[in-house]
Amino acid sequence: MRKRQQSQNEGTPAVSQAPGNQRPNNTCCFCWCCCCSCSCLTVRNEERGENAGRPTHTTKMESIQVLEECQNPTAEEVLSWSQNFDKMMKAPAGRNLFREFLRTEYSEENLLFWLACEDLKKEQNKKVIEEKARMIYEDYISILSPKEVSLDSRVREVINRNLLDPNPHMYEDAQLQIYTLMHRDSFPRFLNSQIYKSFVESTAGSSSES
């Protein structure tokens, strides 16, 4: 009996899996999970090389993380910021300086969220709107995100409803709430910070030299 089984095993060719048919073991089955490293919204390094000629929305959103290009403001303009938060927020140089201060308070995500919402408002392509809306949610609204902004339950409910049919203005309530928070909470401390005072002095010195 043992010899018969041995002869059968010898007669059966071993089935080897071709290298080309092997399934990659880095496949993830949770592509919708915010904390997953292979999220469908994440641009992998190898994909960046293959799609170098095609712009990606992730790259666009990541560009918000970079300080904005701007011209040097005058001393009068910098001083006027202390009287008008709206005016400072409309000036790229003002936003950059305010952002530098927020970073020291570990609340930079508030301004980044506001900028992302402003970027979303400019979009008209429905597919791009859906992708950017989802990315904003994952980056700043989701409780799983380290950059989650502080919003009340009413605003969160509005956002969750809007996610069913995203539109460029779906985060307006949340954006206004964060804008008000920065104005009332962070802005007064910013004006008393060394960052702002030093910038005022430097611009005043530049104006006197010219």
From Swiss-Prot:
Its main location: membrane. InterPro entries: RGS, RGS_sf, RGS_subdomain_2. SMART domains: RGS. GO terms for cellular component: cytoplasm; neuron projection; nucleus; plasma membrane; synapse. Signal peptide: none annotated. Gene3D superfamilies: Regulator of G-protein Signalling 4, domain 2. One of its GO terms (biological process) is G protein-coupled receptor signaling pathway. GO terms for molecular function: GTPase activator activity; GTPase activity. It comes from the Eukaryota. It holds the Pfam family RGS. N- and O-glycosylated in synapsomal membranes. Serine phosphorylated in synapsomal membranes. Residues 84-200 form the RGS domain. Residues 1-21 are annotated as: Disordered. Regulates G protein-coupled receptor signaling cascades, including signaling via muscarinic acetylcholine receptor CHRM2 and dopamine receptor DRD2. Inhibits signal transduction by increasing the GTPase activity of G protein alpha subunits, thereby driving them into their inactive GDP-bound form. Binds selectively to GNAZ and GNAI2 subunits, accelerates their GTPase activity and regulates their signaling activities. Negatively regulates mu-opioid receptor-mediated activation of the G-proteins. This is Regulator of G-protein signaling 17.
